[in-house]
UniProtKB/Swiss-Prot annotation:
Its EC number is 4.1.1.98. This is 3-octaprenyl-4-hydroxybenzoate carboxy-lyase. Its main location: membrane. It catalyses: a 4-hydroxy-3-(all-trans-polyprenyl)benzoate + H(+) = a 2-(all-trans-polyprenyl)phenol + CO2. Homohexamer. The lineage of its organism: Bacteria, Pseudomonadati, Pseudomonadota, Betaproteobacteria, Burkholderiales. Its cofactor is prenylated FMN; Mn(2+). The keyword Flavoprotein applies. It comes from Burkholderia multivorans (strain ATCC 17616 / 249). Gene3D superfamilies: Single helix bin, UbiD C-terminal domain-like. It is an enzyme of class 4 (lyase). Belongs to the UbiD family. Catalyzes the decarboxylation of 3-octaprenyl-4-hydroxy benzoate to 2-octaprenylphenol, an intermediate step in ubiquinone biosynthesis. Prenylated FMN binds at I180, Y181, R182, R194, W195, L196, R199, G200.
Length: 518
């Protein structure tokens, strides 16, 4: 099933019993978070809040709160197990696009050409009179306070845009970048753009500031895109492929785009059927900025991007389950808001796992497996436990072939995808350990690990900025545990032989089990 826009997806979810309309008044200040959190933990449906008090826009929450709904958003209409299998197929497609195998025959060459043609055929197309521009607010009419932007936790600094797809472009780059960055509301037309230094939007901005000092940087933020585009923005798409193109592959039809209306921002294109679009700029700092408040970190300095308007962001409750510290980020000034008639505001919250990002992580885990196996054939399975705050812990199952092999795999995973620079802990086990069962993983650690021999510590590596356990923001250490059986050269001891019952005895007890009535 393919969905041309968010409304199409909502209709399908409702038909499947995967969406519930909430007609009672529920406030976007704390109440939506509490209700969505309870529903997500119970494996419940997406929620469409139709009557947020004081607002004219319904709010969509918990949209990707189960792996099945993530798979549905990618066009896979199946139960949870089949959906996860289909996500592995998606990973195989991505691995083929990222690093295609050389053809070994004319038949293989034909398959490669067919894949290349499929990608080319999904190039996005621009349309005129798009639905996302049916209503336009500009000038004094621009007021972000009219949108039901959630305040998620009691200690949050204010309302927070959470599901905005931020569209940017670097200088002289044909490809646009889509990224999801939280944005703090600080005024009628101002948001703080919290993008970390290594993310695509921040890289585009820094490159622009270096090449065009003193010029406003155009940005668009999309709220309520079709599910394929939204999920394309969080999937490890190869650099040679745009997220819009990838969304077309998921959807089975070319992504329809519209040029932004604001002069200077009209170099950017947004999904034509999006619910709401914010258009504007990050402006250079006007005059001398006020000094940083007492106790706050120093203002950014020494880079071209530092000459642009910045504000102190946070604190906010985050996916770690804690409030993060404050930091300076660029200010996005919204000059125009366009939207569909009867627009829907798409939102979420982040908190102690499980939350929606954790569920997305479970689903995307299945996409990562074929990508890793393409690079490291010895990896037989890979798991990012949701309790590990998305990417902070990874369990790797492998077919070990030589002494030191597990350590090679650790360093390979850390350096493979940008997402894995956040991974603090890697545990490597053999094929006989079910990595999705903590009891088996703990058994392997406690019986196959010597802390001195089998622990790898790596210092001064990139780390999640939100990881307050690291000694320096954005820089910390990593730890690997080799919980595999040890080979000659790794131990001088006779290695333990696992206990296993005789197969004939097990078969007899299987028959007895039924006779006894157990």
């Amino acid at each position: 099933m393919k969905y041309k826009d968010l409304r199409d997806f909502i209709q399908r979810l409702e038909a499947l019993g995967e969406l519930r309309r909430v007609t009672q008044p529920v406030s976007p200040v704390l109440e939506m978070t509490e209700l969505c959190d309870r529903v997500l933990r119970a494996g419940g449906p997406a929620l469409l809040f139709e009557a947020p008090p004081g607002y004219a826009f319904p709010v969509l929450g918990n949209l990707f709160g189960t792996p099945r709904r993530v798979a549905l958003g990618m066009g896979v209409d199946a139960g949870d197990d089949a959906a996860l299998d289909s996500l592995r197929d998606l990973g195989r497609l991505l691995s083929a696009l990222k690093e295609p195998d050389p053809p070994r025959s004319l038949k293989d060459a034909g398959k490669l050409l067919s894949l290349a043609k499929a990608v080319w055929d999904m190039a996005p197309k621009t349309v005129s009179s798009p639905p996302c521009q049916e209503i336009v607010w500009e000038g004094a009419d621009v007021d972000l306070h009219k949108l039901p932007i959630q305040t998620c936790w009691p200690g949050d600094a204010g309302p927070l845009v959470t599901w905005g797809l931020t569209v940017t472009r670097g200088p002289n780059k044909p490809r646009q970048n889509l990224g999801i960055y939280r944005q703090q509301l600080i005024g009628r037309n101002k948001l703080i753009m919290r993008w970390l230094a290594h993310r695509g939007g921040a890289l585009d901005f820094r490159e622009f500031a270096l090449k065009n000092p003193g010029k406003p940087y155009p940005v668009a933020v999309v709220l309520g895109a079709d599910p394929a585009t939204t999920l394309g923005a969080v999937t490890p798409v190869p650099d040679s492929l745009s997220e819009y193109q990838f969304a077309g592959l998921l959807r089975g039809s070319r992504t329809e785009l519209a040029k932004c209306l604001t002069p200077g921002v009209d170099t950017l294109q947004v999904p034509a059927r999006a619910e709401i679009v914010l258009e504007g700029f990050i402006y250079p700092q006007d005059g001398t900025p006020a000094p940083a408040p007492a106790g706050a970190p120093p203002r950014p300095a020494g880079q071209a991007a530092a000459a642009y308007e910045h504000a102190l962001e946070g604190p906010y409750g985050d996916h770690t389950g804690y409030y993060n510290e404050q930091e300076w980020f660029p200010v996005f000034t919204v000059e125009r808001i366009t939207m569909r008639r009867d627009a829907i505001y798409h939102s979420t919250y982040t908190g102690k796992p499980p939350d929606e990002p954790a569920i997305l992580g479970v689903a995307l885990n299945e996409v990562f497996v074929p990508l890793l196996q393409k690079q490291f054939a010895e990896i037989t399975d890979f798991y990012l436990p949701p309790e590990g705050c998305s990417y902070r812990m990874a369990i790797v199952q492998m077919k070990k072939s030589y002494a030191g092999h597990a350590k090679r795999v650790m360093f390979g995973v850390w350096s493979f995808l940008r997402q894995f620079m956040y991974t603090k802990f890697i545990v490597v086990v053999d094929e006989d350990v079910n990595i999705r069962d903590w009891k088996e993983v703990i058994w392997a650690i406690t019986t196959r690990v010597d802390p001195v021999r089998d622990t790898v510590m790596v210092d001064n590596t990139p780390i999640d900025y939100l990881d307050f356990a690291s000694p320096v923001a954005g820089l910390g250490s990593k730890m690997g545990l080799d919980a595999t059986n040890k080979w000659p050269g790794e131990t001088n001891r006779e290695w333990g032989r696992p206990i296993e019952m005789d197969a004939k005895v097990k078969a007899r007890v299987d028959r007895l089990w039924q006779d006894i009535g157990l």
